[in-house]
Amino acid sequence: MEIVPLGDSALVVRVREQFEDAPEETLDEALRVFQLLQRAAIPGVIELAPAYTSVAVFFDPIAVSRSNGAANVLFDELATRIRSAIIPASRRHRRRTAARGTRLTEIPVCYDAEFGFNLDRVAEHTKLSEREVIDIHSTGEYRVACIGFVPGFTFLAGLPKNLSTPRRDVPRKEIPPGSVGIGGTQTGIYPLRSPGGWNLIGRTPLKLFDPTKDPPTLLCPGDRVRFRAITREEFESLKQ
């Protein structure tokens, strides 16, 4: 584990260098660190953001500092508190914290051409039929690695290797909310209308981000996800 500065008001706690070598173990370790830091409630820390191999710690420099020292003093002070919260955790704590992120959520997706603008591109790149792409994508189980880019956007690990497809050369300026896409070795869901360069293969009628709810996101880091193929009629029914 290493702790490195990220600007003047954040640190990154990196649990491993590579994700692909041990995906499940790496996500579990990042989630464990995230949960331990949540419980530690270190004064001055204002936000924690888990990712594939790390947790970003955003803080208020004035609240963290007990002196008027230089920036490196702030970083050293906070890094010491972070290590104190993480390193003493026993194996029992490791198992308990890692197990919390195992909620399974089923996401209905309509893969019709009306929503899957790039389904044909994925099929062509992977040398599969469009039906095979849908079947493979909707029978796998995925893990929410992190949330970012826009509020509620889920980066899902676990995409079958035979569905891996490069991002579009020219991103779209506007992608409809609920669009399900493939970008490289990842799949994910656009929660809000936004630009994006992933290959769109379908759309879910579910609302992934609602700022009036607590938490505001339907999915959280560590959650497991399965997609269920639905018809256009089911899409309209679930959207109401």
Predicted feature descriptions by range:
Residues M1-R96, G101-Q240:
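Glycine-rich active-site loops that engage anionic ligands at enzyme catalytic sites
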